Amino acid sequence: MGEGHRLPVASPRVAAIVPAAGRGERLGGGTPKALRALGGRPMLVRTVESLRRSRLVTQIVVAAPPTLVDAVAQLLGGDVYVIAGGAERVDSVRRALRAVDDDVSVVLVHDAARPLTPPELVDAVAAAVLDGHPAVIPVVPLADTVKEVDADGRVVRTPPRDGLRAVQTPQGFRRDVLSAAYALEDIAVTDDAGLVEALGVPVTTIPGAQEAFKVTRPADLVLAEALLARCDPADDARSAEARSAEARSEEPQFAGARSTDARSGG
């Protein structure tokens, strides 16, 4: 169906962007990370369902691997607008931002690999932006001590842990602020809030949620499966079936996934 798949949405004010075009090499396997099975269902499906359950999100835009736009659109349903993502995450978010409806005033950017994020956290971020904060990020305290090291691996200093936080998503922004941030060039950052910081815009933090961790490595996937099984025994059964299917075929549902050009776009 070409560029994307869109259904009219009545007066949206809050849009959620999900960059999901990346390969996720650290997680292993040939399937794009967002489409890896979790509890018998692709992670992306669970991530989008969390956004659907939000009281405030009125539009969802997903940037998918270019060769899988139609398949992902069919997987997610007609209320989600699916576009072709870019070669890098920043390209995917920039494309998705252009696809957001004109009357949206708040944009959330959410990692596809945070499938257990509570809808309440999504609403808390959106509400904080709607209340007047130009940029809002959820954070959690660090459990581990952090060391700064030099190029040779020697410890340079140990920053006080009390002032450090791990950042989660969704990250929320006034639309004009995020658009201005993505107009910047040659800025190397690891998250959307970093771009906004480069503009000199204040970024506000709110408490995150332990369940909103990012599934990046195989151990994260095991933890996510365990949490799902604890919450819903039926998911544990589906997980076993999914692992069996993956053992029979490395890419049971998305056989064409390896041909995508977007290797790190989500």
UniProtKB/Swiss-Prot annotation:
The keyword Transit peptide does not apply. This is 2-C-methyl-D-erythritol 4-phosphate cytidylyltransferase. InterPro entries: IspD, IspD/TarI, IspD/TarI_cytidylyltransf_bact, ISPD_synthase_CS, Nucleotide-diphossugar_trans. It comes from Frankia casuarinae (strain DSM 45818 / CECT 9043 / HFP020203 / CcI3). The gene is ispD. One of its GO terms (biological process) is isopentenyl diphosphate biosynthetic process, methylerythritol 4-phosphate pathway. Residues 234-266 are annotated as: Disordered. Keywords: Isoprene biosynthesis, Nucleotidyltransferase, Transferase. Catalyzes the formation of 4-diphosphocytidyl-2-C-methyl-D-erythritol from CTP and 2-C-methyl-D-erythritol 4-phosphate (MEP). It catalyses: 2-C-methyl-D-erythritol 4-phosphate + CTP + H(+) = 4-CDP-2-C-methyl-D-erythritol + diphosphate. Disulfide bonds: none annotated. It comes from the Bacteria. Residues 234-251 have a biased composition (Basic and acidic residues). The keyword Manganese does not apply. Pathway: Isoprenoid biosynthesis; isopentenyl diphosphate biosynthesis via DXP pathway; isopentenyl diphosphate from 1-deoxy-D-xylulose 5-phosphate: step 2/6. It holds the Pfam family IspD. Its EC number is 2.7.7.60. GO terms for molecular function: 2-C-methyl-D-erythritol 4-phosphate cytidylyltransferase activity. Belongs to the IspD/TarI cytidylyltransferase family. IspD subfamily. The record marks R161, K214 as: Positions MEP for the nucleophilic attack. The record marks R26, K33 as: Transition state stabilizer.
